[in-house]
């Protein structure tokens, strides 16, 4: 039934920014297992917020949610889309600091985020799934083609780093 998890289903706990909402109460079957998604929203959360050294409201909310989930659960993390917006996050840093190297900035952002998740997960042993950054829905009238291509490159590099760092760190 819609909105109700039965005992036959395995729960996937979904944590993240607004893209996690598309998973809420979603049911699907994989290899004859039935899964049910429960989403927890952290409005405005970026990987940068979680991966930096500063305690902030995003970390506090993430940790509150993360520690309430039963140990050894399946957890889907959907964080990173805001880091990759055309007028926020990485693009804004590059615009304001032209000497910053794009590849290094993205790798540092992703690595710090993954390390943060690994550190939190040491005692919980959750099975972590990292969701990549989706293709944005951009109004082409508001941005020139070069800017859109630059954003596309940022997302491509970001997702490649997410995949590679997650794999390297055995996440």
Q: Where in this protein do the model-derived segments appear?
A:
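Substrate-gating cap/lid alpha-helix
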Residues: 138-171
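Active-site-proximal loop/turn and secondary-structure-junction residues that shape catalytic pockets
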Residues: 81-83, 134-137
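Residue-level preference for short coil/turn positions at secondary-structure junctions
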Residues: 7-8, 70-71, 124
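A structural signal for short, well-ordered beta-strand segments and their strand-loop junctions
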Residues: 13-15, 74-78, 125-132, 170-171
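Conserved SGNH/GDSL esterase-like catalytic core that processes O-acyl groups on lipids
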Residues: 12-112
């Amino acid at each position: 039934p819609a909105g109700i998890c039965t005992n036959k289903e395995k729960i996937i706990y979904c944590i993240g920014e607004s893209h996690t909402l598309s998973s809420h109460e979603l049911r699907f079957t994989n290899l004859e297992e039935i899964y049910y998604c429960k989403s927890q929203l952290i409005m405005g959360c970026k990987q940068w917020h979680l991966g930096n050294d500063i305690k902030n409201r995003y970390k506090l909310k993430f940790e509150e949610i993360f520690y309430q989930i039963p140990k050894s659960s399946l957890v889907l993390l959907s964080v990173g889309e805001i880091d990759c917006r055309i007028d926020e996050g990485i693009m804004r840093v590059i615009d304001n600091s032209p000497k910053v190297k794009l590849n290094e900035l993205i790798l540092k952002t992703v690595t710090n985020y993954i390390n943060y998740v690994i550190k939190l997960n040491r005692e919980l042993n959750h099975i972590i799934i990292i969701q990549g950054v989706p293709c944005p829905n951009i109004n082409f009238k508001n941005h020139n083609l070069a800017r859109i291509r630059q954003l596309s490159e940022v997302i491509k590099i970001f997702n490649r780093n997410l995949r590679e760092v997650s794999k390297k760190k055995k996440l």
